[in-house]
Amino acid sequence: MRIALLVHHWRQGLFYPRWVPELVAGLGYPVLSYYAPATYYLVGGGHLLGVPLAGAMAGVFVLCMLAGALGMYRLASELFGDMGRGASLVAAVAYLYAPYLLANVYVRGAIAEVGAQALLPWILWAARRLMMGADRPAVSAVTLAVLLGALALTHTVTLILFPPLLAGYLLVLWWQQGRSASRLGWALAALGGAMGLSAFFWVPLLAESGFLRQDAFTTSIEVFIPENLWNWNTIVDLNFPFEYTFDVPYQLGILQLVLAVAGIASVRRWTLEWRYWLGVTLWAGLAIGAWSEPLWLGSRAGLAIQFPWRLLSLLSVSLPLWAGWVVLRLHRRTLQTVGVAVLCGATLLWQRPLVAWMGSLATEQGSMPLAAIARHEAITGQWGTGPTREFMPRWSQALHYQPEETDVAAPMQIRLHALSGEGVDAQVTSEQGGAVRLTSFYFPGWQATLGDGTLLEPVSSTSLGLLTVDVPPGSHRLRLTQPGTALQRWATWLTWVTLAGLVALAWRVRLYGVAGVGAALLLVGSLAVLRGPVLNPVLSPAQPFATAALTLLGYRVEQEDPGRLHIYPAWFVMQTPQQDLRLGWEVLDSTGQRVTLAATRPYFNSQQASNWPPGTLVDDAYEVMLPAGLSAGNYTIRLHLLDAENRPLQPSTLLGVVALRATLPAQVSGAEQALALRFGETLRLDSYMLEGPRAMAAGTTLPVVRAGETLVYSLAWSAIAPPLQDYHGFVHLTDAQGAVVAQDDHLAGTFFHPPMSWGTGRVQRDSYRLQVPAGTPNGLLWPVVGLYQFESLQRLAVADSEGQRVGDAYRLPPVKVYTAGDRAAPQQTVDATFGDLAVLLGYDLVLPATGLQPGSEFQLTLYYQARGPAAADLTQFVHLFDPGRGMAAQLDAPPLRGANPTSAWQAGEVIVESLTLRVEPHAAAGLYTLGIGLYNPLDGVRLAVLDRAGQPLRDQIVPLTQLAVHFTFR
């Protein structure tokens, strides 16, 4: 989400947005002032070039992993020498398949930390080459400065953890190599260059950390540190393969630990350098243990790190090196080759990421719309896209407005010229002057200027800590922008000077690639620094709109992508609205026909108007989804004030006319099945599709699935009217008796695009994944679809296309479960053939120990092997009959009570059914024939049957055996 916002600001012309105004429901958040953004820029660059956001992120993950593995290979090659190529390969594979690295990729999605892990072996490699004299010192120094500067911009926590390790390594190498003053000087120069390159980030990070609340530190003390330390039961994962889960603390793999111990035992010569690596391994491992808790809690740096298991980043560098020593212990080259193959193969098998159980939040659009980000914050409570609100300004004491007597709106006239997250340009007229607030947190770096050049001091006001400016009496042109603090500007210039120096030095030592990249960054950075703030012009509404609480000053419109219209109204609040504000945005074509209508609450349905203090200038936002296949042209926008039930409270207001680009045509699959079902009063299920290639049952249209496989149902919803709630949807797989065997319940639509964001006239896709449980018997399962209110669990009524109610859910056509099993082994063979349907292989019979008597029960198990499906669903009959005595027992029912009807039988399928029959209480004593057959329930016609010799059987009945019924006298 942060990456999507970064790309959004690039498109607005802002290269490095320290302040992100779209976060925290439009109140803003200084996330990129305190969170290192380098990997965000890599992903954002790919996305800007047209790669879907999820794809760009996956690509950067792969790039970082492979780059880190190559760096580990180079570092290990430096340490092991020319004879250690196999050992270096083992180290690279051990790094690439380190469980913590893979957990960061597949479980945590921690792209910044993965980027930092990729840099660590390269930094150590460059440091070693600098101190060991492998290259000209200037070349190694430039390389080290660039890599270490990149680390500072990649992951802040790793930057806290790694410098002590690097400093110790440099000193060890310097001492081991004869303590050269020149090499030490170049090392210090490289460290200084890295600090200068990243000064624009780390200087404000440290100097301005006091601008933030202490929530993150408090949470670290109370929760993060105590719950994320190792104890004796959580150090090592003993599973094969390694079990990747969300459980914390993260663990070492047993194979990792065994190889490390074996490698340490294999070291032939304990140089100072290898003793240092042993110390790093022991220190990092011990520091994650519960015994180190006082050290973590007693250090501000420890509290900032939050999770002690982040030291696994350092262990992910040292442990692979020990694995390489296991190979070096093998003296013969043949043994080393075998050892490399065995260790690499074992690492791949043991620590491979088995994470198919995880879901994905990737959006279907390939991007992350602003509205989706706002809704995510509101639904999860992760304001600022993080659980701890670690970058919340200290002036904000609450996220919900708490009125005070001094919070009043001064009488004033405001004519708005321009407004955006970067500032405001307005003409403010007031006889007495007064405070103008913005729906933005106060944070240092804002600058307020009047038209005559007078500077006003921005301050914080209200319990929210809103940005506020006291405007003097009279009529003034007020311009409020955010150029940043003086310290931020100074640190930025220090970075440019350092970068220019490194470009010159890199060119001099013939590092032309480094020099070229640095020169490009200088150019881009210079343009970013020289660029002024971009304030978006505001349009005046065609008709005035006002309530007792607020007035519409203007609006702006952006078509973010062809199918998504953003409307940004600007309000001035005279008094805090006491009732929930719901607005309807209607788009009409040139003939006056409605194209779409969306109804929602303020700021992408993430904020309440009761959070707006008096005297506040509100930069609001709404999303309107445009229907597929909309033609380009001019469209009219009307504004509706609605009550809680979406009923109009006053006549609609003409906002204006906007030119829209054409939207993409609707994509209809040939596998789409039409439905036209209405759910409640606002939603319609137009169609559904069973996604993925599915074999069809022979002679039928039934999809076939094996037990253990997953079905994906894609539903196509549309809104008849704007939904009043974010309904939850479900698809349940049920058996013939209605019992649920698998289900998927979630917020209808997608997590980032729930029902209340749906406008009319547009199809909304919704997917449900259902895994057929292992061991599910062959037969039919029915998917049942519905919607319900999450709080009450009350389902919405379902009506068909004629308006007739069909219940509170709808059963879709069934699927056939068919899993080939063991061959049938009946106790008694029969081999009777029912036409092209099936062969009755045989049966089992279990009689009471006392024999059959009137009223007693006995069990019959039938074994069929299907030859193909029947044209109709036949009924099976089992009769215990004698012509003279009549019927002693009878059972007529579809096979398996309808769970596996004959129309769904597949060639080769074995159908086994156990039946319980009861002898009639008034049955006469005597000998009866137990026989079975099949008939069509529509006309009663029995299916012809042949015996094993191919001869027709009389009355189309298969005689199984004769059973005697006895009387018992008391």
Locate predicted features.
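Intrinsically disordered, low-complexity coil segments
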Residues: F80-S88, M132-S140, V146, W175-R179, ...
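Active-site-proximal, structured, solvent-exposed surfaces of multi-pass membrane proteins
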Residues: Y401-R508, F877, D882, V912
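Asp/Glu-centered strand-loop micro-motifs enriched in Gly/Pro and often flanked by an aromatic residue
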Residues: H47-L48, V424-Q427, R556
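Extracytoplasmic
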Residues: L70, W309, V327-H331, G339-G433, ...
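Extracellular/lumen-exposed scaffold segments
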Residues: A356-I373, G386, F391-A409, L455, ...
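Membrane-embedded transmembrane-helix bundle of lipid-linked glycan/lipid transferases
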Residues: M1-S360, H476-T481, Q488-R531
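Tryptophan-centered motif/residue detector
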Residues: W19-P21, A152, F201-W202, E293-G302, ...
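Membrane-interface loop/short-helix elements at transmembrane-helix boundaries
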Residues: A216, D425-S430, Q559, G563-L565
